[in-house]
Amino acid sequence: MSNYFNTLNLREQLDQLGRCRFMDREEFATEADYLKGKKVVIVGCGAQGLNQGLNMRDSGLDVAYALRQAAIDEQRQSYKNAKENGFEVASYETLIPQADLVINLTPDKQHTNVVETVMPLMKEGAALGYSHGFNVVEEGMQIRKDLTVVMVAPKCPGTEVREEYKRGFGVPTLIAVHPENDPKGEGWDIAKAWAAGTGGHRAGCLESSFVAEVKSDLMGEQTILCGMLQAGSIVSYEKMIADGIEPGYAGKLLQYGWETITEALKFGGVTHMMDRLSNPAKVKAFELSEELKELMRPLYNKHMDDIISGEFSRTMMADWANDDVNLFGWREETGQTAFENYPESDVEISEQEYFDNGILLVAMVRAGVELAFEAMTASGIIDESAYYESLHELPLIANTVARKRLYEMNVVISDTAEYGNYLFANVATPLLREKFMPSVETDVIGRGLGESSNQVDNATLIAVNDAIRNHPVEYVGEELRSYMSDMKRIAVGG
């Protein structure tokens, strides 16, 4: 197999990268009806597999789980997840031939083996679904021409897919049809019905492509979503401890600070996040973020270049073939960092204190979001895709850090995301440690400015506000958040 993206000519590559359209609610008028009366078989019962299946069943679809015979015989966790929730569970050989839609929700590194195993068992004219297109785009999986290949990619962890559905809503979702595999022209009908079955249509769906989803997803998770949180946590903790801040306070400020600060992003973008700071703190955060952008832009661009060229995938798949030696080694190193092992503390930190004493974190978030967005859009990825894979997902990932530090983040994200996170953080951490942090003081991380006045120069503040508010990520973010708010009011009757 060869990298599918690299087999396309430049015009085709740009066309696929640029696929992104916010779909009207009316396009989902029939909701999941297209799949009713048909058999949906999910392969894999982890977080995405279980929670998508629960939602689809509650939407009136016939859902079953196909597992390897060994997983059934040994009653592994995937078997327990499905069985304890009342689903039909059986072997590939039993269920796959019955399926009208087979959804592969196993980890990326298992996709080739899974698809090569289930494809001979699939009936003529069935459909194969993915929630991440790595296998198709990066590994170049060749799929039988009679099979329709679709993607429904919720933009959040699987647990959130379920919780939002139970609230009567859903999570924003990318949907796509593989242009090489739509023999009956029903791909979009299948994808829309599947997305509606998960509740994604209530939050808003983007008509995308396998290529756009993969390239933007890889870039976001490697840089701002995971890599920047990891590198920022490590160097910020080191700085605070070196300057005499109590370890329990320093760790707590970081562990819960990312979540608190990025929650402001969710409601009002970078503008609102920066507005949570006092005027002097806002100016300081802006100045720091500009320094960070200049320092880190080459690293962000290198990751984007390696993702576009396929170099990242080649490197990671070589590690797969070597029993994940690098992945496991980097995971162990992360577990040994000082931040991961800070002592628990019952010190209370108010919401505003996370902003006041975490000015550097705000600066890192602004710099990281804008750098990731700029690198993606400069490579042909449409603004909407770049927004979802940078700013939108950041509060969700920050929430995992709040639960159990970096360990939880790396457990919840995919192995692909974890590997990319380490590649980025392994370079970003020493870069920040050596080139940026020596000039940083605890007035921006740990203690606050302690200003007695909110006064700043008017011209300076106006220039800072203009720069923040006029970034393209703010324009597209405001538009997409308004769509989601409108849909939420419709969905929950608000």
From Swiss-Prot:
Mg(2+) 1 binds at residues 217, 221. GO terms for biological process: isoleucine biosynthetic process; L-valine biosynthetic process. This is Ketol-acid reductoisomerase (NADP(+)). Its EC number is 1.1.1.86. Binds 2 magnesium ions per subunit. It is an enzyme of class 1 (oxidoreductase). It comes from Aliivibrio fischeri (strain MJ11). One of its GO terms (molecular function) is magnesium ion binding. Belongs to the ketol-acid reductoisomerase family. The keyword Amino-acid biosynthesis applies. The active site is at 132. Substrate binds at residue 414. Residues 209-344, 345-487 form the KARI C-terminal knotted domain. NCBIfam families: ilvC (TIGR00465), PRK05225.1 (NF003557). Involved in the biosynthesis of branched-chain amino acids (BCAA). Catalyzes an alkyl-migration followed by a ketol-acid reduction of (S)-2-acetolactate (S2AL) to yield (R)-2,3-dihydroxy-isovalerate. In the isomerase reaction, S2AL is rearranged via a Mg-dependent methyl migration to produce 3-hydroxy-3-methyl-2-ketobutyrate (HMKB). In the reductase reaction, this 2-ketoacid undergoes a metal-dependent reduction by NADPH to yield (R)-2,3-dihydroxy-isovalerate. Mg(2+) 2 binds at residues 217, 389, 393.
